[in-house]
Amino acid sequence: MEGQAAETNHRAETVVRAELCLSAEQGPETTAYSQKRCLFLPMEVWQEAQQLLALAAPAFLSQLMIFLISIVSSIFCGHLGKVELDAVSLAITIINITGVAVGTGLAGACDTLISQTFGGSNLKLVGIILQRGILILLLFCFPCWALLINTESILLLFRQDPEVSKLTQIYVLIFLPALPAAFLYQLLAKYLQNQGIIYPQVLTGFIANIFNALFNYILLYVLGLGVMGSACANTVSQFIQMILLFLYIVWRRLYADTWGGWSQACFEEWGAFIRLAVASMLMLCIEWWAFEISMFLAGVLGMVDLAAQAIIYQVAIVVYLIPLGLCIAGSIRVGHGLGAGNTEQAKRSALVVLCMTELCALLSGILLATLKDVVAYIFTSDPNIVALVSYVLPVYSACLLFDACVAACGGILRGSGKLKVGAISHTVGYYVIGLPLGISLMFAAKLGIIGFWFGILACGIAQSIFLIIFVFKIDWKRASEEAQTRASERVEIPQKIDNKPSVYQEGCPTEQGDVDPGNVESIEFSQSSTSSEGTSPTPAGAAQHTRTLILTRGLALGCAVGTLIIGIVIRLSV
C-alpha cells in the first residue's frame, strides 16, 4: 500500500509539473484568452477540448502517414501500364482487407486495456498487456498468410482477369514477410498512443514514407522491376516503419515505467484480450469490407461508375482521418478517466468528443459539397467521371455527418470496453440495413453508385441513433468499476534505481513518472480473486497452472500453424 501511495503521489506531482510547464509556455495572453472563452464554455469543457485536440492532431497525422505508404506505391505504379496498375491496386486492397485491417483491429484491444490500466496507474501491467498482444497478433498472422497465399485462386473464382490475378499474387507473396512487421507496428503505436504519446508515430511514419518513395523510385524507375519492385518497396517500408518506432522507444526510454521484462504472465488472461480484440477487429473490418464490396459492385456497372466510386472512396478515406483522430483522442481520454475512477472526466470527455467530431464533420461536409464540381479534377479530367463524382458528393457529405458520429461513439465504446456493442451495431448497420438497401437501389432501382451511398446514409442514421442512445445510457460508475477490475492485476517489481530519467515527450513531463525501473530482477503477480485464470498460491497449484498454460498456448500455436498448412495444401492442389 505504501508503494502504491508513493507512486500515486509521484504521478500527481508529475501532472502538476506538466500543468505548470504548459501554463508557462502559454503565457499571460493565452491564459487571458482561455478565461475569455470560459465565458461561453465551462472551464472544464474548454480544458477537455484542448486536451482532446492535443491528442487528435498527432493522431490524425500518424494515421495519414500510414495511409500515404499505400497511396505513394500506387502513384509510382501509374506509369507501368493498365494491367500492372490494376494488379498493384488490387494487391494493396487485398493486403489491407485481409491482413492490415485484421492486425489493426486486433490491436484495438489495447484501446481498452492499456488506456484503462494506464489511467489506473498499474504501469507494469501495461507492459504485460503489450507482451500478450505481441504473442496473440503474431499467431493471427498464420491464418492471414493462409488466405493471402491463395489470392490468385480466389480472384479467378470471382472471374478476375488471369494476368492481373497472377501479378497480384506475385505482389502479395513478396509482401508476406512484412505482415508481422505491420502488425507489430500497429501494436507499438497503440502501446504509446494509449499512454498519450503520439508524436513518435508521426515522426517515424514520415521517415518511413520518405524511404518508401525513394525505394519505389529506385526499384521502378532505375532498376525497372515493375510490380515486384513496388512490392519490395512496400515490404521494406513496413519493416523500416516498425523498426524505427521500436528504436525510438528504446532511445527515448519510453518503455521505462511500463516494461518490467518478459514474464510468464504474458501467457495468462488471453481470453479477455482476445474477446476485446475480435470485437475491435469486427468493428473495423465490417465497415472496411463493406466499402470494398461497393468497389466490386461499381465495377459491374461500368468503368465510369468504378472510377467515380474509387475517387469518392479515396476522398472519403482522407476526410475520415479527421474524425478518426478525434475518435482516438476520445478513446484515450475516456479510458484514462475510467481507469483512474474519474467518472465525471470520462463522461465529459465523451460529450465533448461527440460535439467536436460533429462540428468537424459539418465543416468538412459543407466544404466538400461546395467543391463538388472541383474535387474530381484532382484525379481525372474525364468529363463523365467528373460529372458523376459531382452528382454523388452531396450525398456523401450527408453520410459524413452520421459516419463521424458513429466514429466518435466507437471511440467512446473502445475507451469504456463496450466493443461488443460496436461490433453488433456495425454488423446490423452495414449488412442488414446499409448494403441490402444500397445494392437494391444500385441495381433494382437503377440509381447507380449514388444508390449505394443512400444505403450507407441509412446505415449511418440508424447506427447514430442507436449508439447515441447507448452512450447516454452508459452506467459510468459501473464502467469505471469494470475498468479498475481489468487493471487489478498487481505487479510488484524489486528495482534498482540508476538515476536515468525516462523521457516521454520532449519538453514538459507527462502524466507518467520519470523514474527508471532499472534492472528488473523478478516479477510477482497476485491476481484478483475474480480472475478466471488466476494462479494458485501453492507450489503444486502453480505447477499445474504452468502445465495448463503450456498445453493451451501450445494448442493455440498448433491451430495457427495448422491453418497455414491447410492454406499451403489448397494452393498446391488447386
From Swiss-Prot:
Topological relation to the membrane, as annotated: Multi-pass membrane protein
Segments of this protein annotated with the region Disordered: 500-541
BP GO terms, sorted: organic cation transport; xenobiotic detoxification by transmembrane export across the plasma membrane
Major location (coarse): membrane
Topology feature Cytoplasmic, residues: 1-51, 108-133, 190-204, 252-271, 331-350, 406-430, 473-549
Transmembrane annotation, as ranges: 52-72, 87-107, 134-154, 169-189, 205-225, 231-251, 272-291, 310-330, 351-371, 385-405, 431-451, 454-472, 550-570
Location in the cell: Cell membrane; Apical cell membrane
Compositional bias ranges of the Low complexity kind: 521-538
Extracellular topological segments: 73-86, 155-168, 226-230, 292-309, 372-384, 452-453, 571-574
GO function terms (MF aspect): antiporter activity; organic cation transmembrane transporter activity; xenobiotic transmembrane transporter activity
Keyword Nucleotidyltransferase in record: no
Catalysed reactions listed for this entry: thiamine(out) + H(+)(in) = thiamine(in) + H(+)(out); estrone 3-sulfate(in) + H(+)(out) = estrone 3-sulfate(out) + H(+)(in); creatinine(in) + H(+)(out) = creatinine(out) + H(+)(in); agmatine(in) + H(+)(out) = agmatine(out) + H(+)(in)
Any one GO CC term of the record: apical plasma membrane
Keyword entries, A-Z: Cell membrane, Membrane, Transmembrane, Transmembrane helix, Transport
Family note: Belongs to the multi antimicrobial extrusion (MATE) (TC 2.A.66.1) family.
Functional note: Multidrug efflux pump that functions as a H(+)/organic cation antiporter. Mediates the secretion of cationic compounds including drugs, toxins and endogenous metabolites. Plays a role physiological role in the excretion of drugs, toxins and endogenous metabolites through the kidney and liver, into urine and bile respectively.
UniProt protein name: Multidrug and toxin extrusion protein 1
